[in-house]
Amino acid sequence: RQGKDANNGEFHESLNSLAAILGAGLVGIDKTNQDGYNYVKMVQNYFNSDNGWNIMMNNTNPAVANLGGGYGRDWWYDVLPNALYYAVCDVFPNVDGAERIQRSIAEQFVKADSVLNGNYDYSYFDYKNLKGYVNHIPMQQDAAGGHAYVLLCAYHKFGDPRYLEHCKSALEALISQKESRFYEALLPLGVYVAAYLNATEGTNYNVSKLFDWVFDGCQSSSGRTGWGIIVGKWGDYDVSGLQGSITDGGGYAFLMNSIKPAWPFIPLVKYQPEYAKAIGKWMLNNSSACRLFYPGDIDEKHQWAPELKNITNNNVSYEGLRKADDYGKESLKGVSPVAIGDGPKWIEGNPAESMFSIYSSSPVGILGAIITKTDVEGILQLDCNATDFYVDKPYPVYLYYNPYTTICLCTF
């Protein structure tokens, strides 16, 4: 946020607030009673009813939304806050007013899916007038995955069969695509829904196809071309598993996008364990590479602004990790990778400090809740229940992946 004085203190984004509250709750911090505040109650201010949309949105109102960030014009920005809010409400149940908001979100998503009727070929959707629009950004058909996830959570919470019906309808709209339409962060949620329904509802959705669409990325010239999972080494650093653009400047990974898929993918293996080895391998690589966004964990010569790293306390990361600098900084010529950010590009005169990103760092508690080190270097204990929301969890479930060619013994 820009502080209490700029724009009446109202310029802040729910993607930051919700992700931070979720991550904190997952690692045991009570955000309903911290420093004299109930942050979980406060975050309800992102519920937009005055504009008639009646869902959680990325900003509190349209006036500040025009200052930046997605709001009412970029579909994933309007769907993801609702998935995050449902997750927050499972971690922090029984907060006054939350159930009313959750019910409203579910009803709006049912109405939207009914109107869309299998056709998600839009850049964004007006949840007041129930109409889809195409603008200058690519169509985001993977918003259907976000709809499906929220409606599955709503079905678990409220038991309304309409929510399950439209969860399936949205998922079928996603699966009916002819190619990957991976846009930002919603497709992985759809993969989870497909696996869950296959295990619990007797469906036969093609989970492998959805995984391919995430990992191989969008290859359509009409979509967000190149958006997928990065594989390989940049210089001496292994960056396999990170998510972002496979093609932009040879590769451009983002921390937020690298963290978020762990939320649906790790619990998914409970429902389709044939993917356990692949997901375990991905998570080991991804979690290792995620450290490279933090200024205290990557060599200074690979950072755009190493002289500023102390302001982060190594809690706030760079927004991105590029294969090569795209600002033309002389000292970074031939250096790969480079910890970097887009902040200075958004508004002329933005300082280098804007490369450090709360937006990117806020969901890190998701990794904190899932990952525990074992007594064998390179073998992680991954908690498959940590981010499996609104389901019965009668016993602990952990995923261990052994990257070695020999048998290893871990202490449980």
Regions flagged by a language model, labelled:
Residues R1-F412:
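Catalytic domains of carbohydrate-active enzymes that cleave complex glycans
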